[in-house]
C-alpha cells in the first residue's frame, strides 16, 4: 500500500538542510548522479542526496524522511555489484531520499583489539589500517568486488563469498533503526554497550567513544562473526550448498538486512593476522578443479583462508595489469 506524503517536498528539503547543512543536501541532477547511479546496475531519480556528518544527524534525517512518508535508501561507498544502494528505475510510488553515510567515519577498537565497533562510513581499508599495528585483521581485508567497500555494506549483504574459513560477513551485535507497525521510528541498541536511554544520548556517546570498559557487555549471548561456516563449507556431500543468497540462517537483524533497517554501528570480531601463501591452479578440465576443491575442504586440518574460481581471461588480465592495481591499492587504499 502506498504511503501518502505528509508534507511538501520544499518543507522536507528545508528540514533536511536544517539537520545537516545546505551544503550536504544535493538536489541537482549532476551533483547527485554519482550517488544515484550504481557501480554496475541501478539508477534513478531522487528528491535529494543527503550526507549527514554525525550519527545524530543521520537519525534526524531518517526521522524527517520517515515522518514525511518518503522512501529512504541507505548508501555508504556505493560499490555493490548487485544493486540496492541506489534507485532502480523511476517506477516508485513516492519520492526517494538517498542517505549517503561516508562522512560518518569511525573505527573504535574494544576488548584489547579482539573486537571493533564500526560506524556507517568506515571502510575495509581503514579498518585494516587500524588493526595492523595490533597484529589483527578484519573479516575481509579488501572488498572482493570493489575497492573502497564499506564495512556496514558488507554486513547488510553478507559479503565475503571467497572467504572459506571466516564465511559471510555477519554479526548479531548492532545499533540500528527500524520503522514499527504504527509507522513510528525506533532505535534499537543491540551493540552490547551501555550508552544511555534516548536516541540522542546513545548516538552522541557512541560517536565520541564516550563509554568505558565496564559499559561493554562481554557475555551477550550473541556472536560477532559466523563461527559455523567453516564446518558447513566442509560438508561437501550435503544436499544443500554451504553458501547461497538470502540464507535464512545468516539473516539476523542488521546482518543480511539489505536496506530493510537503517544501521548506525556494528560490533565485529577481529582475527589474528596469519602468514599466507597464494596458489594458482589451472586446468582445462573442470573435474580437476572439483577434485582440488574437495581435497582442500576435507583433507586439510583447517580449511583454506579463501578460494576463488577465476576464468582464463580474468587471470590473463590480472597477470598483465594486476601489479598496477596492487600498487594503487597499497599506496592509496
Model-derived features with residue positions:
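C-terminal substrate-recognition/cap domain of FAD-linked oxidoreductases
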Residues: 35, 267-273, 277-333
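A common structural junction motif
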Residues: 20, 67-70, 135-138, 297-306
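Short, structural beta-strand-to-alpha-helix junction motif
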Residues: 54, 79, 115, 122-127, ...
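FAD-binding subdomain of flavoenzyme oxidoreductases
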Residues: 125, 132-136, 140-290
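N-terminal flexible segment immediately upstream of the FAD-binding catalytic core
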Residues: 1-67, 80-117, 143, 268, ...
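General beta-strand structural signal in soluble alpha/beta enzymes
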Residues: 24-29, 51-52, 72-76, 83, ...
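Short, conserved charged micro-motifs
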Residues: 9, 57-60, 126, 286-292
